[in-house]
């Protein structure tokens, strides 16, 4: 009798869980079309996955061979790879003495992966070697070489790479030093800061307001946002860091609290950016002109941008306490399309929706990879076609 009751109880619980996935069909009108999105666990569920609390995706990049590399933040940071031929996420191990990797992962022309860590601020080098033939590394450390700290006493906030020159550029935190690392020689050079002071009067923002990402133009110059919302340029030829006379778009008076959360350089040479206040802008490096393209979403923050094979720019954003939303922008006619919440609903098996997005990048075939940054996180795959 007791056994029957337990079985009945299990059935009721299972039925209840399935019922939660059985949403009203009208809900599908406000989410990303379900034939264009999918989700991946960070490993082989239910056992060989990056642990909860350590799996917030905060950095993504595409290697020259098309593989996706990503890093997480949390109690520990992990490195992972996704080979599009296989389609699954392979954990490569945790990064020693690291709790955060934020837009600080790049891949060299030779395929080596470089990671900027926080809080220690070390540069790590990972050299891939027949990864798909290696066992999953969830509880083991990632096999990396420690190249030492970039800026003494600072964490690394962002990295960008000039593959042809073999130079990695970075931004430190909390004191916003811009530095460069030459791969061939191992030489690190500090070029100064993009912010000297934190903004006054904002209780929620106590640190310096600097961009969370770096952008390279087609000439190899590097851009960041800094104090009072001004853009900064590192001139590759002159090897100097200067403040440009252009500020980020936003509400007048909020310039000190504005920063770039995401950058995207297009093949035309134009650079698009999304700000902490949720504005999309276009920057022409040659003309030194910033165009305010408005707010695609009512919410704050644009946390990811990627270029589609159809020429449209896709983005994600939203407040951390609300569901993340996806949009597209057509540079040809200047129109926006709100694509909906980032949600994967596979009735009746499971449903998963994202609140906070930590990174976004497009693969060579046009697939958009979107990293969730929560206590329990997934990697989303969006297909624009």
Where are these regions (language model features)?
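A short helix->beta-strand "capping" segment at the edge of beta-propeller domains
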Residues: 30-54
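Beta-strand-rich domains and repeat architectures in extracellular enzymes and scaffolds
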Residues: 47-77
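Surface loop/turn motifs at the tips and blade-to-blade linkers of beta-strand repeat domains
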Residues: 48-53, 93-97, 146-152, 192-196, ...
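Repeated scaffold domains used in trafficking and secretory/extracellular systems
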Residues: 55-59, 99-105, 153-160, 208-213, ...
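Residue-level detector of Asp-centered blade-edge/turn motifs that repeat once per structural unit
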Residues: 62-65, 107-110, 161-165, 216-219, ...
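Conserved beta-propeller blade signature
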Residues: 68-70, 112-115, 167-170, 221-224, ...
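Short loop/turn segments immediately following the C-termini of beta-strands
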Residues: 73-74, 118-119, 173, 227, ...
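Blade-level signature of beta-propeller repeat domains, shared across WD40, Kelch, NHL, RCC1
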Residues: 354-385
């Amino acid at each position: 009798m007791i056994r029957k009751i337990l079985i009945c109880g299990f059935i009721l619980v299972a039925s209840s869980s399935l019922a939660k996935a059985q949403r009203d069909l009208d809900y599908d009108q406000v989410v990303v079309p379900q034939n264009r999105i999918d989700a991946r666990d960070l490993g082989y569920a239910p056992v060989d996955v990056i642990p909860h609390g350590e799996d917030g995706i905060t950095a993504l990049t595409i290697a020259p061979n098309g593989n996706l590399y990503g890093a997480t933040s949390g109690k520990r940071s992990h490195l992972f790879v996704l080979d599009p031929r296989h389609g699954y996420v392979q954990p490569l191990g945790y990064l020693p003495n690291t709790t955060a990797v934020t837009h600080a992962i790049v891949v060299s022309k030779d395929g080596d992966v470089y990671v900027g860590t926080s809080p220690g601020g070390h540069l790590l080098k990972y050299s891939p070697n027949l990864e798909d033939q290696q066992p999953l590394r969830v509880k083991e450390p990632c096999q990396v070489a420690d190249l030492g700290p970039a800026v003494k006493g600072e964490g690394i906030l962002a990295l960008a790479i000039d593959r042809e020159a073999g130079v990695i550029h970075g931004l430190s935190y909390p004191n916003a030093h811009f530095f460069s690392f030459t791969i061939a020689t191992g030489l690190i050079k500090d070029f100064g800061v993009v912010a000297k002071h934190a903004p006054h009067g904002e209780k929620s923002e106590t640190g310096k307001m600097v961009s969370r990402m770096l952008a390279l133009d087609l000439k190899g110059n590097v851009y960041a946002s800094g104090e009072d919302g001004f853009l900064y340029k590192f001139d590759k030829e002159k090897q100097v860091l200067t403040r440009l006379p252009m500020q980020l778009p936003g509400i007048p008076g909020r310039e000190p609290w504005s920063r770039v959360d995401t950058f995207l350089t297009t093949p035309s040479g134009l650079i698009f950016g999304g700000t902490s206040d949720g504005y999309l802008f276009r920057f022409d490096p040659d003309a030194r002109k910033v165009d305010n393209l408005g707010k695609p979403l009512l919410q704050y923050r644009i946390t990811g941008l990627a270029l589609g094979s159809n020429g449209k720019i896709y983005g994600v954003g939203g407040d951390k306490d609300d569901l993340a939303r996806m949009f597209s922008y057509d540079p040809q006619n200047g129109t926006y399309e709100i694509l909906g919440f980032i949600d994967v609903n596979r009735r009746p098996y499971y449903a998963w929706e994202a609140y906070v997005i930590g990174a976004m990048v497009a693969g060579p075939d046009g697939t958009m990879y979107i990293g969730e940054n929560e206590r329990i996180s997934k990697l989303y795959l969006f297909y624009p076609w």
